[in-house]
Amino acid sequence: MFIENFKVESPNVKYTESEIHSVYDYQTTELVHDEKNGTYQWTVKPKTVKYEFKTDVHVPKLGVMLVGWGGNNGSTLTGGVIANREGISWATKDKVQQANYFGSLTQASTIRVGSFNGEEIYAPFKSLLPMVNPDDVVFGGWDISDMNLADAMARAKVFDIDLQKQLRPYMESMVPLPGIYDPDFIAANQGSRANNVIKGTKKEQIDQIIKDIREFKEKNKVDKVVVLWTANTERYSNVVVGLNDTMENLFASVDRNEAEISPSTLYAIACILENVPFINGSPQNTFVPGLIDLAIKKNTLIGGDDFKSGQTKMKSVLVDFLVGAGIKPTSIVSYNHLGNNDGMNLSAPQTFRSKEISKSNVVDDMVSSNAILYEPGEHPDHVVVIKYVPYVGDSKRAMDEYTSEIFMGGKNTIVLHNTCEDSLLAAPIILDLVLLAELSTRIQLKAEGEGKFHSFHPVATILSYLTKAPLVPPGTPVVNALSKQRAMLENILRACVGLAPENNMILEYK
């Protein structure tokens, strides 16, 4: 059974006009390695920590500024939100299609809230806490190309022509602000697009981005802004002591106009200084140590890296299943080809290397979780290939071969073929990232013994379900298994309304 909304009635939760206040018993374990009777042994001690959560229920008017607004992802997301807001339908060769938010965790998935008369009851994910309605989001952003969003949508060739015709009047007046362009960080083949760039030193470029954010906020009368990088994948930045390893050194490097400070890092610096959440949707190492240091000191949300949309999402499910079933993946070979501008930019070796790293690390935590299957230091052979094939456009092909060892020396091979519209998978993920980032800024918590409420850690692990290479605070374990990531996100939001985590025990029927 499906219900549209619900309210929790419990002594552990209180609703007021301004906030939801909940008390939550967090049950976890503590491990002790000590000597008993002359030998060392592990002891696991269950423990309960009481937390309190406060969620501001005022839903702000949200502005979203995209770096790379005129790219396939930016034009697809903007057009998709307009189509939903205006209730647009269009003819395809199969049927009349209605606008929807399929592919969005927040808008098109559900959570289990209990059972009634022997039937499971589900509610929309977005009903857990007050969230921004995507139809109300105001879009803007930057691009190194001055092409308006209607022409960018036509160039992308993602939407059906009938839909493009209906969207054009809404989008042809949308023109990106000039963006930061540094040809050293992206493929040379992107130079022909770069007719809309911010001149000056790196310090002057940061100042211009700050000015753009302030003017966008004022012009559109939005309460909050979230900035997200959906521009070209950059090459990795060199992390060097004295250059970008601390906040102070990073600022000094900007003042010296050091060449190794990337455009994406400059955008992030501007956002952090303005206390505006910044999310990196590409695989490069935007968040150099000095930038993370700055975000922590300014307590500004940062999240990333790289949208987890197709092949990698499947991988984080399948490898988790295999290792969890006691099957040993020994070889993972992933091949991709695509023909959009992302594929064109990734045809350069230095930018491909960034993508290869983010795609390759996705199985690490699952492998390290099972020392029965893997010896220390042992890891599956893992190869990732991406090729640019212009003809296929945004219709990305992904082929994977998983070879595993099974019972008594046997071998098992699984082969997958996945064809998808790259931007139609990425756009709802971008939407989820900005909506959840905004929601995160309205949640405060404190553990038993802490004197006052505080926000989540600025490095937003809560967004990890949506990213290939989750950014985590120093010393925090990285979790890539998709089911664990979703459970973490859902259960934190459940805690904010005083609900227990979904453990699937269903003891009442046992």
Curated annotation (Swiss-Prot):
Its EC number is 5.5.1.4. It is an enzyme of class 5 (isomerase). Pathway: Polyol metabolism; myo-inositol biosynthesis; myo-inositol from D-glucose 6-phosphate: step 1/2. The keyword RNA-binding does not apply. Keywords: Cytoplasm, Inositol biosynthesis, Isomerase, Lipid biosynthesis, Lipid metabolism, NAD, Nucleus, Phospholipid biosynthesis, Phospholipid metabolism. It catalyses: D-glucose 6-phosphate = 1D-myo-inositol 3-phosphate. It is found in: Cytoplasm, Cytosol; Nucleus. Its main location: cytoplasm. NAD(+) binds at residues 70-73, 143, 180, 190, 193, 230-233, 281-282, 306, 309, 340-342, 355, 393-394, 422-423. It comes from the Eukaryota. One of its GO terms (biological process) is inositol biosynthetic process. One of its GO terms (molecular function) is inositol-3-phosphate synthase activity. One of its GO terms (cellular component) is cytosol. Coiled coil: none annotated. Its cofactor is NAD(+). InterPro entries: Myo-inos-1-P_Synthase (IPR002587), Myo-inos-1-P_Synthase_GAPDH (IPR013021), NAD(P)-bd_dom_sf (IPR036291). Belongs to the myo-inositol 1-phosphate synthase family. Key enzyme in myo-inositol biosynthesis pathway that catalyzes the conversion of glucose 6-phosphate to 1-myo-inositol 1-phosphate in a NAD-dependent manner. This is Inositol-3-phosphate synthase. The lineage of its organism: Eukaryota, Viridiplantae, Streptophyta, Embryophyta, Tracheophyta.
